[in-house]
């Protein structure tokens, strides 16, 4: 009995690990990006990239900087799908957007912004979403702005998130290896 439980646990772990979706965050901006995920900030130099693996059950966001007034790349891996969207819903220093019904209404209610950096999410073989400026149509602009979430099978081989898409990609500074 214990052997069956151990084998099932190992196989379940392997299956979960096998379904990890690599998300590569690339910085085409002229300045560094502070990739933040509500727990950790990683600096991505201009022209450089970093990869995070999203496992089944992941639900969260990534943005440039710790300030919540930012363009968000939002992901959920659940029920056999990778769900993704860009959000520019304004938040304020003291309050969230509440029940606002437009981008302008949310900005007035929160006295805040939701856009800080151009961004594109491009899953392999699925619909890309792009937000180059405040008010972009591919992004959630207010809480009930339905229809902005997209889905891919969780077998999607990779996702590329690009900060400042369309900008000439700077050269990534060489990293020296210390012996």
PLM regions and their residue ranges:
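Fungal secretory targeting signals
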Residues: 1-22, 178-179
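Extracellular low-complexity, O-glycosylation-prone Ser/Thr/Pro/Gly-rich "stalks"
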Residues: 23-179
């Amino acid at each position: 009995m214990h052997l069956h439980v151990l084998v099932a646990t190992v196989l379940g772990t392997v299956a979960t690990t096998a379904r990890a979706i690599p998300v590569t965050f690339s910085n085409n901006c002229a300045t560094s990006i502070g990739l933040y995920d509500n727990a950790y900030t990683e600096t991505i130099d201009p022209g450089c990239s970093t990869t995070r693996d999203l496992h089944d059950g992941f639900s969260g966001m990534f943005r440039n900087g710790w300030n919540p007034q930012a363009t968000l790349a939002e992901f959920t891996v659940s029920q056999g799908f990778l769900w993704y969207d860009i959000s520019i819903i304004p938040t304020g220093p003291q309050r969230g957007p509440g029940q606002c019904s437009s981008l302008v209404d949310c900005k007035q209610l929160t006295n805040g912004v939701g856009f800080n950096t151009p961004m594109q999410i491009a899953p392999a073989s699925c619909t890309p979403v792009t937000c180059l400026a405040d008010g972009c149509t591919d992004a959630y602009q207010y809480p009930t702005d339905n229809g902005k979430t997209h889905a891919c099978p969780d077998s999607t081989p990779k996702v590329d998130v690009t900060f400042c898409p369309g900008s000439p990609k700077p050269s990534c500074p060489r990293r020296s290896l210390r012996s």
